[in-house]
Amino acid sequence: MHLHLRGICLVLAVASSSSSALAADAGHGADLAKRWCASCHVVANGQAVASADVPSFASVARRPDFSSEKLAFFLLDPHPKMPSFPLSRTEAGDIAAYIGSLRP
């Protein structure tokens, strides 16, 4: 019985994480990225100015280990060189979904 309950919990956890990734709004993420991220990163085709020492969003999306879920968690607590924006979980998920939409 305990193993059966454990299996059900695992299935529900996977399903809820998948549905939250599917619920992310890449269009809203693009808007947020252009507003908050474009001063450092190239966030869209045709963008002319960004910092040269940071990856473009397209290059992040092309990484073999790219994961929208991992990126969204990272955005909630970024590395020290990156400004700390007050992103909600939804906003972080939306930006990550936008970056994921840039995958070839």
Curated annotation (Swiss-Prot):
Changing S84N: In strain: CC705 / UW505. SUPFAM superfamilies: Cytochrome c (SSF46626). Binds 1 heme c group covalently per subunit. GO terms for molecular function: electron transfer activity; heme binding; metal ion binding. One of its GO terms (cellular component) is periplasmic space. Transmembrane segments: none annotated. Changing V60F: In strain: CC705 / UW505. GO terms for biological process: nitrogen fixation. Changing D25N: In strain: CC705 / UW505. Keywords: Electron transport, Heme, Iron, Metal-binding, Nitrogen fixation, Periplasm, Signal, Transport. The keyword Heme applies. It is found in: Periplasm. The keyword Iron applies. Heme c binds at C37, C40, H41, M82. Residues 1-23 form the signal peptide. Its main location: periplasm. Monoheme monomer. Has the tendency to dimerize. Belongs to the cytochrome c family. This is Cytochrome c-552. It comes from Bradyrhizobium diazoefficiens (strain JCM 10833 / BCRC 13528 / IAM 13628 / NBRC 14792 / USDA 110). The gene is cycB.
